[in-house]
């Protein structure tokens, strides 16, 4: 074989998958870069990560369903908003009471120290939540679902103001800027209602009435920080039982306000018993306010009700009302359970991101006709602008909060969450990461006093004295 043949042989043999000695050569095909992405994702998905993703997806899904069902319940009880407010308050009392009784008598989940916690603090929290729920339900009847979601975000700047006044809380420029943008988004979202061109049955008076709910809601958030400061771990079912009980009691005393409210919330003092009776009939699916016709013709009388969303007197639509209210209360409990699960397993940062994502998804669902029916709220230019502005503000506020939380964590802080279902329709405020200072027990203070007198007390006794309980909060 000539030299030229030898030089050509490797090339020819490689084409035939053979080397110089006749052995077979395996040619490795190049692998596309994107083919390994699914495997990389699978390898990075630990059991804990999958669990967190499931909790987040279920939280967002249940949150969207919860908001939609709340508006559907309001539409069913348009003429009986106060009855609905009390129904949602008293309806949770036996549920939370049964779970609390079981945990007290058959488990050790609720220790004596928790049961000794002053109930007056629950009463104050319940009173504030009752006022919030009153504004939410009464005003929500004539406030469209998308606008409700946007107005709810105003609780963030109002909570910041209340925290600054009562807790001397300080906020970063990023948080303040985000709050101002949120306010701008709320104002933008109210413009269509003020100009009279809004859809979904929005009425300016009731829109502002609904917006007022963020004031007692913000005060409730701040009081939870003050009243439960010394509580290391409050059982959520025990807290909700007392909160719903006092919320129901104080809610009854708000009835006189309806005497001076315009329709459809007007209920005179002498009409309270017939009103509650008709509300109960509506719950059972019986319509009391129905169209009246002129001498059997198809023409309505001047005082007849209509089914138009912007009507002064709206006809009852109580069909299957009891089914809708049961679904709402069930989903509401499930939704709040997932809030706690996301906070526990994923943390406040993931919860904040999921909560922000839930806002546009909910408003999209409100615009789908086959879900909302006649209560559908199509997007308008200003409603989209308000949504985008609020999302930008929420993003800025969340980023500022995350930075603040990281600084608090570096300084030894910890996320302290006061779980609360709160009134219907009002979102929980995002937990703030702050340093938790455990209060000193009486025995610890006594040993400390002896130490100042020159009496030597071993360090172990300090620790033992302070680990007994959280003291009389």
Swiss-Prot record:
Residues 1-49, 102-121, 168-175, 229-248, 344-352, 396-473 are cytoplasmic. Glycans are attached at residue 295. Residues 71-80, 143-146, 197-207, 270-322, 374 are vacuolar. It comes from the Eukaryota. It is found in: Vacuole membrane. Keywords: Amino-acid transport, Glycoprotein, Membrane, Transmembrane, Transmembrane helix, Transport, Vacuole. GO terms for biological process: amino acid transport. GO terms for cellular component: vacuolar membrane; vesicle membrane. The chain crosses the membrane at residues 50-70, 81-101, 122-142, 147-167, 176-196, 208-228, 249-269, 323-343, 353-373, 375-395. It is a multi-pass membrane protein. Its main location: membrane. GO terms for molecular function: xenobiotic transmembrane transporter activity. PANTHER family: PROTEIN CLT2, CHLOROPLASTIC (PTHR31326:SF1). Nutrient transporter. Involved in maintaining the osmotic homeostasis of the digestive vacuole. Belongs to the CRT-like transporter family. This is Crt homolog 1. It comes from Dictyostelium discoideum (Social amoeba). The gene is crtp1.
């Amino acid at each position: 074989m000539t030299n030229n043949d030898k030089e050509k042989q490797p090339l020819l043999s490689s084409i035939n998958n053979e080397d110089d000695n006749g052995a077979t050569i395996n040619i490795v095909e190049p692998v596309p870069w994107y083919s390994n992405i699914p495997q990389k994702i699978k390898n990075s998905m630990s059991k804990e990560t999958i669990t967190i993703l499931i909790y987040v997806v279920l939280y967002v899904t249940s949150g969207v369903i919860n908001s939609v069902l709340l508006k559907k319940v309001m539409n069913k009880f348009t003429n009986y908003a106060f009855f609905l407010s009390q129904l949602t308050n008293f309806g949770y009392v036996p549920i939370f009471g049964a779970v609390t009784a079981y945990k007290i008598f058959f488990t050790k989940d609720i220790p004596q120290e928790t049961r000794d916690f002053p109930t007056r603090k629950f009463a104050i929290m319940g009173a504030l939540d009752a006022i919030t729920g009153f504004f939410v339900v009464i005003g929500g009847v004539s406030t469209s679902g998308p606008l409700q979601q946007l107005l709810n975000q105003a609780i963030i700047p109002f909570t910041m103001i209340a925290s600054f006044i009562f807790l001397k809380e300080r906020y970063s420029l990023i948080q303040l800027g985000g709050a101002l943008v949120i306010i701008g988004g709320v104002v933008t979202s109210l413009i269509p209602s003020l100009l009279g061109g809004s859809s979904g049955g929005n009425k300016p008076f009731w829109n502002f009435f609904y917006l007022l709910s963020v004031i007692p809601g913000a005060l409730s958030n701040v009081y939870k920080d003050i009243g439960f400061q010394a509580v290391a771990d409050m059982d959520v079912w025990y807290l909700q039982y007392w909160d719903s009980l006092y919320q129901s009691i104080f809610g009854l005393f708000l009835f006189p306000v309806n005497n001076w409210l315009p329709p459809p919330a007007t209920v005179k003092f002498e009409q309270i018993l017939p009103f509650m009776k008709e509300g109960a009939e509506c719950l059972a699916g019986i319509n009391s306010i129905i169209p009246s016709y002129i001498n059997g013709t198809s023409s309505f009388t001047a005082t007849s009700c209509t089914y138009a969303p912007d009507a002064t007197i709206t006809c009852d639509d109580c069909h299957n009302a009891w089914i809708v209210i049961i679904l709402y209360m069930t989903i509401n409990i499930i939704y709040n359970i997932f809030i706690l699960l996301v906070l526990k397993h994923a943390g406040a940062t993931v919860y904040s991101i999921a909560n922000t994502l839930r806002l546009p998804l909910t408003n999209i669902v409100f615009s789908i006709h086959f879900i909302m029916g006649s209560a559908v709220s199509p997007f308008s230019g200003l409603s989209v602008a308000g949504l985008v502005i609020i999302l930008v503000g929420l993003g800025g506020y969340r980023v500022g909060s995350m930075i603040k939380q990281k600084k608090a964590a570096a300084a030894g802080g910890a996320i302290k969450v006061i779980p609360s279902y709160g009134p219907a329709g009002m979102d929980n405020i995002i937990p703030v990461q702050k340093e938790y200072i455990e209060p000193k027990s009486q025995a610890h203070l006594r040993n400390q006093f002896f130490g100042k007198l020159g009496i030597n007390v071993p360090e172990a006794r300090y620790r033992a004295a302070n680990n007994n309980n959280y003291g009389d909060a």
